C-alpha cells in the first residue's frame, strides 16, 4: 500500500496517541502504526488516576477515548508490525 502522510507514528500507546491528536488537529495527515493493540500496555491497567484532566478511569477507556479523539481530527490507524525504515530522497519509507 502506497499512501503519503505528513507523519507516521510508530507505536499506539498514550504518547503516540497524544502525538496523533495534536498533529491531526493541526491538519497533518497522520497514520499511527501499532503492532499489537492500540493503547499499548496501559490498556491492562484497571485504575488510571494520574492523567491530566482525568480524575479516575481505566487504561482501556482512556486510550479508546484518545483514539476516538485522534480519529475525529482525521488520524488513521493500522495494526501491523513495522519491519524497516528507509530514506529515499525527501521521503521516508515505512515497511
Map each language-model feature to its residues.
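Glycine-rich FAD pyrophosphate-binding loop
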Residues: 8-10, 25-44
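A secondary-structure boundary/capping signal
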Residues: 13, 34, 78-81
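Short Gly/charged-rich anion-binding patches and loops
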Residues: 18, 37, 65
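Beta1/beta-strand and adjacent pyrophosphate-binding region of the FAD-binding site
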Residues: 2-15
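Gly/Ala-rich phosphate-binding loop of Rossmann-like dinucleotide-binding domains
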Residues: 20, 24
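Residue-level preference for short coil/turn positions at secondary-structure junctions
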Residues: 3-5, 26, 78, 90
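N-terminal Rossmann-like dinucleotide/flavin-binding domain of flavoprotein oxidoreductases
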Residues: 43-95
Amino acid at each position: 500500500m502506497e499512501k503519503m502522510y505528513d507523519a507516521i507514528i510508530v507505536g499506539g500507546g498514550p504518547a503516540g496517541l497524544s502525538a496523533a491528536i495534536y498533529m491531526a488537529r493541526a491538519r497533518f495527515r497522520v497514520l499511527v502504526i501499532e503492532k499489537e493493540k492500540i493503547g499499548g500496555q496501559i490498556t491492562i491497567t484497571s485504575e488510571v488516576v494520574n492523567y491530566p484532566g482525568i480524575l479516575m478511569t481505566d487504561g482501556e477507556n482512556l486510550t479508546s477515548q484518545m483514539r476516538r479523539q485522534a480519529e475525529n481530527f482525521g488520524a488513521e490507524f493500522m495494526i501491523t508490525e513495522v519491519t524497516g525504515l528507509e530514506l529515499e530522497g525527501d521521503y521516508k519509507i515505512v515497511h
